[in-house]
From Swiss-Prot:
Cofactor(s) needed for function: Mg(2+)
Family: Belongs to the HAD-like hydrolase superfamily. Cof family.
UniProt organism field: Cronobacter sakazakii (strain ATCC BAA-894)
Annotated catalytic residues: D8 (nucleophile)
NCBIfam families: Cof-subfamily (TIGR00099), HAD-SF-IIB (TIGR01484), PRK15126.1 (NF011705)
A Pfam family recorded for this sequence: Hydrolase_3
Primary gene name: cof
GO molecular function, a single term: 4-amino-5-hydroxymethyl-2-methylpyrimidine diphosphatase activity
Membrane-crossing residue ranges in chain numbering: none
CDD domains, alphabetized: HAD_Pase
Protein's name in the database: HMP-PP phosphatase
Superkingdom: Bacteria
Residues at which Mg(2+) binds: D8, D10, D212
Range of residues in the leader sequence: none
Length: 272
């Protein structure tokens, strides 16, 4: 019996239009009523996730910034990790010869010098917005993470350069095909879920986790029950071939799985 459920947002709980479907909301409420502790593990900002939780009236722990922050439902900060100022400085002021736009996250919000309203489509449900900022003048301390947004091929080239420059000073991963993130070393959703489970006195064997992207890899591999979305990144499927694959986020596959698990816990699950 799972005691802790960890859920990625984009490509997992959220549908392609970045909305949280009614079936998914109902399934999450049922899971909570059954006594399972909920945790949303996402690259999204704490401020945005709090707005989302208010909309669905659900109590949950928040793992935000891809594991750089953990908050209790009460709002208490349980864990925080930032990029070192040296790494933030190197990324912000380095010349990377890339077409990718640059986005910086700290506790105040989402900062960028790229005014592209299309980026807000993914945040329409919450109303979360970026703040236009001269990133070259931004202090390098207290930076949670830095993201690059571009097509996947351009980001693959950039990833090689970042890894060569930063080495073990940062954790670099794809949170989507078009988003490459620079995080503090050792920071990922899996490490954050381990820290949260220890805080709650729950073993990782009693955790189930759902995800679709490479920033979910550690969380899915460490959870007692890791479930991969049918729309997952090919790299994730290749790296975790032993984990079960459920349906597509467009069909609210997490809700489908949870409903089966709640109603028929002893029967094998089929995505169809």
């Amino acid at each position: 019996m799972a005691r802790l459920g960890a859920f990625d947002m984009d490509g997992t709980l959220l549908m392609p239009d970045h909305q949280l479907g009614e079936a998914t909301q109902m399934a999450l409420h049922r899971l909570h009523q059954r006594g399972v502790t909920l945790a949303f593990a996402t690259g999204r900002h704490l401020l945005e996730m709090r707005q989302m939780l208010q909309k669905i009236a659900l109590e949950a722990f928040l793992i935000t910034g891809n594991g750089t922050r953990i908050h209790a439902p009460s709002g208490e900060l349980l864990f925080a990790e930032d990029l070192s100022p040296q790494v933030a400085e190197a990324v912000l002021h380095g010349y990377w010869d890339t077409s990718a736009s640059l986005h910086v996250f700290n506790d105040s919000g989402w900062l960028t010098d790229n005014d592209d309203p299309a980026l807000l489509d993914a945040h329409a449900w919450s109303g979360f917005r970026y703040q236009l900022t001269d990133l070259k003048r931004l202090p390098a301390h207290q930076v949670t993470k830095i993201c690059f947004v571009a097509d996947h091929d351009a980001l693959c080239e950039l990833r090689v350069k970042l890894c060569q420059t930063l080495g073990s000073q940062a954790h670099i991963c794809f949170s989507a095909l078009d988003c490459l993130e620079v995080l503090p070393p050792g920071c990922n959703k899996g490490a954050a879920l381990q820290a949260l489970s220890q805080h709650l006195g729950i073993t990782m064997a009693d955790c189930m986790a759902f995800g679709d992207a490479m920033n979910d890899r550690e969380m899915l591999s460490l959870a007692g029950k890791g479930l991969i979305m049918g729309n997952a990144m090919p790299q994730l499927l290749a790296e975790l071939p032993h984990l079960p694959v459920i349906g597509h986020c467009s069909r609210q596959a997490v809700a489908h799985y949870l409903t089966h698990w709640l109603d028929h816990p002893h029967l094998d699950y089929s995505p169809e």
